[in-house]
From Swiss-Prot:
Chief site of localization: cytoplasm
InterPro entries named among the record's database cross-references: DNA_clamp_sf (IPR046938), DNA_polIII_beta (IPR001001), DNA_polIII_beta_C (IPR022635), DNA_polIII_beta_cen (IPR022637), DNA_polIII_beta_N (IPR022634)
Residues spanning the signal sequence: none
GO cellular component, one term: cytoplasm
Gene of this entry: dnaN
Record has Transmembrane as a keyword: no
Family: Belongs to the beta sliding clamp family.
Species of provenance: Rickettsia conorii (strain ATCC VR-613 / Malish 7)
Keyword terms, alphabetized: Cytoplasm, DNA replication, DNA-binding, DNA-directed DNA polymerase, Nucleotidyltransferase, Transferase
Any GO MF annotation of the entry: DNA-directed DNA polymerase activity
Protein name: Beta sliding clamp
UniProt cross-references to PANTHER family, sorted A to Z: BETA SLIDING CLAMP, DNA POLYMERASE III SUBUNIT BETA
Lineage: Bacteria, Pseudomonadati, Pseudomonadota, Alphaproteobacteria, Rickettsiales
Length: 379
């Protein structure tokens, strides 16, 4: 039966990832549990929520090989509260899993290992590797515009697709569009799948982990599943959304009549300040643009009003340039602008306008492989 010795700090992070995968209100006991498998000097932790399956391996001192399943939440809550020290985990059979730490001991009920689902196999139609840094970049640049409307299920994830040597991620909620891509080292089969929001968020946490961020991630694609293998010790298999993502190229404006170039941080900070006055029912800020100034204003029902003026400047920290003699007043949901401005770290941002009702194209000169489109609102 399973018996192993492990450092608390080694176990706590893996349990954090596992707990994040497991649904908080899972009514099926097997899916609320985590499977612990001790073998060959490693502890494998397996967790699932039926739509995605996470397997992690960490180095431990295996005294006796074996496996068992226990409540993910309970085990995670216990380990997080323990001081840094050695833990001994022992499967005692009918009396459960014993967790022995410094001056403390816990016994957790277990379920039969046979009731825990195994990770499905995948027959990949395409596979490739990219750096975790690049993968994190395209997911972070697009995840915020995923639709939360469950009736539009084909928009409830990020559209991962390969076209020639470009690996792209795109998402839209009907009001905004986010596209980010990286160039692969070699050309592979063109492909397109919709990764659910939950799966995108979970794999993003893993690739951003300090021990993985400088590694590569292998991606295996099939028509209904995707598998990620990171650092050889972590793999995640996810179901895909069965739907067709819209041809987003038709939403990207091809021309514009005016252009705003502005310091990204200054612009983001100003919008965030003015947005405080707005209310959830109708969130809108108005941008009034001219060659000399940008005025950002808002009126909040039962709150008041706010205004901030940015003057034309060529200084790096306060750069503002509007290239049209025709003034423009246009409204936006401030959250949509804030999300874009926070997604890409760049000194300046460019906004391309056609008229007050047309979608606005947003680009970052230092990050040419990120494109955003935001619909304006009436103000």
């Amino acid at each position: 039966m399973l018996k192993l010795i492990v450092e608390t700090k080694t176990l706590v992070q893996s349990l954090g990832f596992a707990s994040s995968v497991v649904e908080k209100r899972n009514v099926i006991p097997e899916y609320a549990n985590i499977k612990l498998s001790a073998k060959d000097g490693n502890l494998e932790l397996s967790s699932t929520n039926m739509d995605l399956y996470l397997s992690q391996k960490i180095a431990v001192q295996v005294v006796s090989e074996g496996e068992c399943t226990v409540s993910t939440k309970t085990l995670n809550d216990i380990v997080r509260k323990l001081p840094d020290s050695e833990l001994t985990l022992t499967d005692l059979g009918t009396t459960g899993l014993e967790i022995k730490g410094k001056n403390c001991k816990f016994n957790l009920f277990t379920l039969p290992v046979s009731s825990f689902p195994a990770m499905d196999s995948i027959n990949p139609e395409a596979s490739f590797k990219i750096s975790c840094t690049d993968f994190a970049k395209i997911i972070e640049s697009t995840k915020f515009s995923i639709s939360l409307d469950e009736t539009r299920y084909n928009l409830n994830g990020v559209y991962l697709h390969i076209k020639d040597k470009e690996f792209c991620s795109a998402s839209t909620d009907g009001h905004r569009l986010s596209i980010s891509w990286v160039t692969l080292e070699k050309q592979i089969k063109n492909f397109g799948v919709i990764l659910p929001q939950k799966s995108a968020e979970e794999i993003l946490k893993i690739v951003k982990d300090p021990k993985n961020i400088n590694e590569d991630i292998e991606i295996l694609l099939s028509s209904n599943k995707i598998k990620f293998i990171c650092n050889e010790n972590t793999s995640m298999l996810s179901k895909l959304i069965d739907g067709t993502f819209p041809d987003y190229s038709t939403f990207i404006p091809e021309s514009s009549s005016s252009k705003l170039v502005i310091n990204r941080k200054m612009f983001a900070d100003s919008i965030e300040r003015i947005a405080i006055i707005t209310v959830e029912k109708f969130r809108a800020v108005k941008l009034s643009l001219s060659r000399e100034t940008l005025e950002i204003s808002a009126v909040g029902e039962a709150r008041g009003n706010a205004k901030e003026v940015i003057n034309s400047s060529q200084d790096k920290e306060s750069f503002y340039e509007y290239n049209s003699d025709e003034s423009l007043a246009i409204g936006f949901n401030p959250q949509y602008l804030e999300d874009v401005l926070k997604a890409v770290k760049s000194d300046v941002v460019e906004l391309y306008f056609s008229d007050v009702s047309a979608p606005v194209l947003i680009k970052f000169p230092e990050n040419p492989k990120d494109i955003f489109v935001v619909m304006p609102v009436k103000v």
